[in-house]
Swiss-Prot record:
CC annotations in GO: cytoplasm
Subcellular location per the Swiss-Prot or TrEMBL entry: Cytoplasm
Function description: Specifically methylates the guanine in position 1207 of 16S rRNA in the 30S particle.
NCBIfam families: PRK09489.1 (NF007023)
Family, similarity comment: Belongs to the methyltransferase superfamily. RsmC family.
PANTHER family registered for this protein in UniProt: RIBOSOMAL RNA SMALL SUBUNIT METHYLTRANSFERASE C
InterPro entries: DNA_methylase_N6_adenine_CS (IPR002052), Mtase_sm_N (IPR013675), rRNA_ssu_MeTfrase_C (IPR023543), RsmC/RlmG (IPR046977), SAM-dependent_MTases_sf (IPR029063), Small_mtfrase_dom (IPR007848)
Protein name: Ribosomal RNA small subunit methyltransferase C
Secretion signal span: none
Record note on quaternary structure: Monomer.
HAMAP family (alphabetical): 16SrRNA_methyltr_C
Enzyme Commission number: 2.1.1.172
Length: 342
């Protein structure tokens, strides 16, 4: 990452205020400012594996990835800088976790784009850390308060679930389509044949619903699931366990931690990164899939109909077909041949 996000640019206006502070950075960190900010000590906690990849190179063990924060990296911080995400339940989970570990008196800064709903931080933290707005620039707000009362926090109390047919889908704040099966995934599932065999990889697995439904009618399938999101990784593991299915679930930035080749790769790829529209992950998925598919294997993805994926599929695989479509979504299939662009 080279350029700074609008939220980081607002923080840089106040950089002189943090030079003596032991800062914990958390939330939706879209750049490497935590590694470059002038502080007495900088540490970072993130639930996003691709953010950890960027920050861990310059910060080493001072950057941590996981569902909940490590108490050891939080305890001696005297300042929290929290980047507000677009998902309010995700923000609430993270902030309650962090504030339950930080000492009373900690300086708390919350920064985010106005369109992300950062204003709601005031009401959310009112009982624990009353906030005041201290700056407004770049269509962002910066809020400050001091921790007055640690909240109670138990991650086990944040789980939710819903049913898809006879399957139990486990979810957590921050997981895509947390409240029920989304229309795109449902369309993709309608194209999957019973009794599928071989090795199947679900990229961007979310709560694990695609893999769970596939396993329910294809018991011989061998599953691997991956996602950048720590809540998604934990939710997918819980979904498989709740339904008695086996499979490996790994944190991975698309294929970064994936080894070997598969007979099918399925995905409902994201096209947002934070508040911004981003096709990078989906294009990486398509272009790199050929290095993770067996000959004759296939990539099957669902996407918003307006997204420009057919050209990328044809450039990479030399073929694609539309298996199903609605006014909003299309399910694409591309088959791995010997002439694919590897």
């Amino acid at each position: 990452m080279s350029g700074f996000s609008p939220a980081s640019e607002v923080l840089l206006r106040h950089s002189d205020d943090f030079t003596e502070s032991r800062v914990l950075f958390a939330g939706d960190m879209q750049d490497d400012l935590p590694a470059r900010f002038d502080t007495a000590q900088s540490r970072a906690h993130t639930q996003q594996f691709h953010h950890w990849q960027v920050l861990s190179k310059p910060m080493g063990d001072n950057a941590r990835y996981g569902l909940v924060a490590d108490a050891e990296i939080v305890a001696d911080s005297d300042t929290l800088i929290y980047y507000w995400p677009k998902n309010k339940p995700e923000a609430q989970f993270q902030l309650m976790n962090l504030l339950s570990l930080l000492p009373v008196g900690t300086d708390v800064f919350v920064v985010g784009e106005n369109r992300s709903g950062v204003r709601s931080a005031e009401a959310m933290l009112e009982a624990h850390c009353p906030l005041n707005k201290v700056d407004s620039a770049r269509r962002c707000g910066l809020y400050h308060g001091r921790l007055e009362k640690q909240p109670e926090f138990n991650a086990d109390g944040w789980w939710g679930e819903y049913q898809v047919d006879d399957l139990t889908i486990k979810t957590l704040p921050g997981v895509f389509s947390r409240d029920g099966l989304d229309v795109g995934s449902d369309l993709l599932l309608s194209t999957l044949s019973p009794h599928t065999k071989g090795k199947v990889l679900d990229v961007g697995c979310g709560a694990g619903v695609l893999a769970a439904v596939l396993a329910s009618h294809s018991p011989k399938v061998r599953l691997t699931l991956c996602d950048v999101s720590a809540p998604a990784v934990e939710a997918s593991r819980a979904t498989l366990a709740a339904n008695g299915f086996e499979g490996e679930v790994v944190a991975s930035n698309v294929f970064s931690e994936i080894k070997g080749r598969f007979d099918m790769i399925i995905s409902n790829p994201p096209f947002h990164d934070g508040m911004e529209t981003s096709f990078e992950a989906a294009q990486t998925l398509i272009r790199s899939a050929v290095r993770h598919l067996n000959i004759g294997g296939e990539l099957r993805i669902v996407a918003n109909a307006f997204l420009p994926y057919p050209n990328v599929l044809d450039e990479t695989f030399g073929n694609h077909e539309v298996l199903a479509q609605t006014g909003r979504f299309k399910v694409y299939r591309a088959v791995m041949g010997r002439n694919a662009k590897r």
